[in-house]
């Protein structure tokens, strides 16, 4: 307000109400069953083979579908694509973590992000995603996605969540033992496929298994707030496009209460970011600059 920004939150104020849903996995309910082309089944072992990402919309998640392998799950327009030779509509996509070689560091980070992998799979029509670390052995080596936080839109749809997007039915974290298991009878050599991917050669194909998954999630909703200030754009058309500068207050969320404060406040992450954000806004206003796009 003192800097002179236009309030852009709820009710013409600076604050915007944000509902965040904490989703907690009931790990005793997690079931995943592989089925081969002959109808033979194999029950996977929770934490050794897989751990579900808690579903932010459904307390009882159920999914089944044909497994397809799509490498890193990357699709770059006019460039590298793990999806160009495979149809994943209605299927469960198996991906490995990481990104193809030869990208600049920011793109490597972008395409390695699990949320971006699941978003791409969803846009291609997949019903579910399994992301596997080929080096993980299961158990303590598998990152346990037992709890996740998701920002919800007013209609209780997903605004942002690390893992789920749209109406994906399931997202699982998997292990190297699971990867070896689903490569059996595929006609593909797992080590060779992984080596090809590491060298930038995409490799995508249908696997000889389907999977059925079910698990339970408990939801707890709580309210947080964004602080929104606007500098309107000067161009009558381009003002409808927005440049966003953002920062966050907490460091690693919340934890044990110390002197009445449970927030993990951080100096560099991210008090310096908030200070920088305020300084950017001050410079915009004090310089007399009139950006064409809204900021």
Which residue ranges define each predicted feature?
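Noncatalytic luminal/extracellular "stalk/propeptide" segments of secretory-pathway proteins
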Residues: 1-93, 97-100, 219, 223-226
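Extracytoplasmic/secreted envelope proteins and their assembly/folding machinery
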Residues: 15, 80, 115-118, 171, ...
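Short, well-ordered beta-strand micro-motif
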Residues: 69, 173, 228-232
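Short Pro/Gly-enriched beta-strand edge/turn motifs at strand-loop
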Residues: 12-17, 206-215
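Flexible, low-hydrophobicity surface segments
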Residues: 60, 82, 88, 94-162
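Second-shell loop/turn segments in exported
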Residues: 19-20, 29-31, 53-58, 69, ...
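Protein/peptide-recognition domains central to ubiquitin and immune signaling
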Residues: 1-48, 131-149, 155, 169-170, ...
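Catalytic-core environment of secreted peptidases
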Residues: 1-7, 24-26, 35-38, 85-87, ...
């Amino acid at each position: 307000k003192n800097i002179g920004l236009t309030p852009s939150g709820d009710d013409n104020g600076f604050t915007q109400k944000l509902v965040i849903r904490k989703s907690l996995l009931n790990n005793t309910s997690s079931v995943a069953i592989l089925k081969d082309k002959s109808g033979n089944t194999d029950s996977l072992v929770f934490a050794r083979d897989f751990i579900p990402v808690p579903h932010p919309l459904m307390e009882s998640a159920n999914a089944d579908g044909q497994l397809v392998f799509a490498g890193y799950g990357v699709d770059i327009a006019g460039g590298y694509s793990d999806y160009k030779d495979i149809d994943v509509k209605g299927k469960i996509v198996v991906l490995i973590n990481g990104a193809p070689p030869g990208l600049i560091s920011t793109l490597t980070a972008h395409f390695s992000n699990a949320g971006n992998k699941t978003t791409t799979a969803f846009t291609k029509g997949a019903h579910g995603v399994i992301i596997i670390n080929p080096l993980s052995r299961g158990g303590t080596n598998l990152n346990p996605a037992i709890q996740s936080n998701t920002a919800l839109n007013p209609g209780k749809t997903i605004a942002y969540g690390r893992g789920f997007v749209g109406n994906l039915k399931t997202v699982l974290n998997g292990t190297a033992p699971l990867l070896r298991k689903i490569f059996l009878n595929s006609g593909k050599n797992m080590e060779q496929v992984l080596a090809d991917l590491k060298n930038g050669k995409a490799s995508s194909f249908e696997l000889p298994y389907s999977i059925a998954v079910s698990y339970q999630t408990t939801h707890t909703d709580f309210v947080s707030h964004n602080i929104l200030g606007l500098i309107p754009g000067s161009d009558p058309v381009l003002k409808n496009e927005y440049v966003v500068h953002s920062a966050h207050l907490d460091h690693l969320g919340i934890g044990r209460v110390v002197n009445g404060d449970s927030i993990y406040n951080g100096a560099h992450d991210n008090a310096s970011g908030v200070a920088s954000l305020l300084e950017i806004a001050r410079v915009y206003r004090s310089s007399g600059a009139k950006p064409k796009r809204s900021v």
